[in-house]
UniProtKB/Swiss-Prot annotation:
Molecular function GO labels: 4 iron, 4 sulfur cluster binding; 4-hydroxy-3-methylbut-2-en-1-yl diphosphate synthase activity (ferredoxin); 4-hydroxy-3-methylbut-2-enyl-diphosphate synthase activity (flavodoxin); iron ion binding
Species lineage: Bacteria, Pseudomonadati, Pseudomonadota, Gammaproteobacteria, Enterobacterales
The name this protein goes by in its record: 4-hydroxy-3-methylbut-2-en-1-yl diphosphate synthase (flavodoxin)
SUPFAM superfamilies hit by this protein: Enolase C-terminal domain-like (SSF51604), Nitrite and sulphite reductase 4Fe-4S domain-like (SSF56014)
Record-listed E.C. numbers: 1.17.7.3
Cofactor binding comment, as recorded: Binds 1 [4Fe-4S] cluster.
Signal peptide start-end: none
Organism: Providencia stuartii
Protein family according to the UniProt entry: Belongs to the IspG family.
Length: 365
């Protein structure tokens, strides 16, 4: 029930990663990356399928060897989501996975090699109608750029990116997106801002090596939030030293918070105090776990007392405002006669949410 996002997105060109449109106003795609051994086909397929279940749009898979390329071929046949092959050092691996149906090639300008090698990769990508991501990383810049700037700077990252953008331009290849990632928030943000002024291609956002689940989520939310609020970004990945499933959840939460893209329930819940009339924290935790399968966008407010409860409920799809023994229930901003028993509030609210989701899904069909 909240208003649409006020963010005006940067105009960019359109490419496709598999069947997923990127850029030119398409929904910002949420990406993750497997952390299994790619040669372990079963483990990698299982992880990709777990990412599919939480709504991932694109999955990147590291392909460090020719053996991994052979495994990638088998993996691609068993999953539905578009796959990006992450290529470093050996350009021949990129050409091999292109034959095997990869949906996008990620190459690192800092280690992929000479312009002639890039030309061969581009020729292969063109032949197989595959886009490329130029993936610059502050930790692996070309040696001459490192020597020129002394340390990673926005100008250094963007110079690395533009060097390879120019190569693709000379080769008349425009099916690409670019990333300029860094582990430092301000370095990454500055790099993306500078790059956004120079090219029209889609930008893939990320704070690389952000950290564990908590610290990495915070870093990513700050850095990507700054850029997204300025309209910069067409795809994103939250890089966490954690289960990749968490990357997808955090990515969607960031987009929901900025009202850029909604998937599933946006829970609005108070931090609780002595005024709470039911167990708010337990209720929210239980519902988040129970309702992970709901992809229908909706706002659900769960407030433990009548101070802010009614006000939040009035601007939510569904809402509960705590009261003695039985709490008030709101739907589409209107208070209902029905009240929830505080001792059974989780089950009652789950039933209401599922029913509302089903109704909204019917309306949008």
């Amino acid at each position: 029930m909240h208003n649409e996002s006020p963010i005006k997105r940067r105009k960019s060109t359109r490419i496709y990663v598999g069947n997923v449109p990127i850029g030119d106003g398409a929904p910002i795609a949420v990406q993750s990356m497997t952390n299994t051994r790619t040669t372990d086909v079963e483990a990698t397929v299982r992880q990709i399928q777990s990412l599919e279940r939480v709504g991932v749009d694109i999955v990147r898979v590291s392909v460090p060897t020719m053996d991994a390329a052979e495994a990638f071929k088998l993996i691609k046949q068993r999953v539905n989501v578009p796959l990006v092959a992450d290529i470093h050092f050996d350009y021949r691996i990129a050409m091999k996975v292109a034959e095997y149906g990869v949906d996008c090639l990620r190459i690192n300008p800092g280690n992929i090699g000479s312009e002639e090698r890039i030309r061969q990769v581009v020729d292969s990508a063109r032949h197989h109608n595959i886009p490329i991501r130029i993936g610059v990383n502050g930790g692996s810049l070309e040696k001459d750029i490192q020597e020129k700037y002394g340390e990673p700077t926005p100008e250094a990252l963007v110079e690395s990116a533009m060097r390879h953008v120019d190569i693709l331009d000379r080769l008349n290849f425009d099916q690409f997106k670019v990333s300029v990632k860094a582990s430092d928030v301000f370095l990454a943000v500055g790099s993306y801002r500078l790059l956004a002024q120079k090219i029209d291609q889609p930008l893939h956002l990320g704070i690389t090596e952000a950290g564990g689940a908590r610290s990495g989520s915070v870093k990513s939310a700050i850095g990507l939030g700054m850029l997204l609020a300025e309209g910069i970004g067409d795809t994103l990945r939250i890089s966490l030293a954690a289960d990749p499933v968490e990357e997808v959840k955090v990515g969607f939460d960031i987009l929901k918070s900025l009202r850029i893209r909604s998937r599933g329930i946006n829970f609005i819940a108070c931090p609780t105090c002595s005024r709470q009339e039911f167990d708010v924290i337990g209720t929210v935790n239980a519902l988040e776990q129970r309702l992970e399968d709901i992809i229908t966008p909706m706002d659900v407010s769960i407030i433990g007392c009548v101070v802010n409860g009614p006000g939040e409920a009035e601007v939510s799809t569904l809402g509960v405002a705590g009261a003695k023994t039985k709490s008030g229930f709101y739907e589409d901003g209107v208070r209902k006669k029905e009240r929830f028993d505080n001792d059974n509030i989780i089950d009652q609210l789950e039933a209401k949410i599922r029913a509302k989701a089903a109704m909204l899904d019917e309306i949008t069909v």
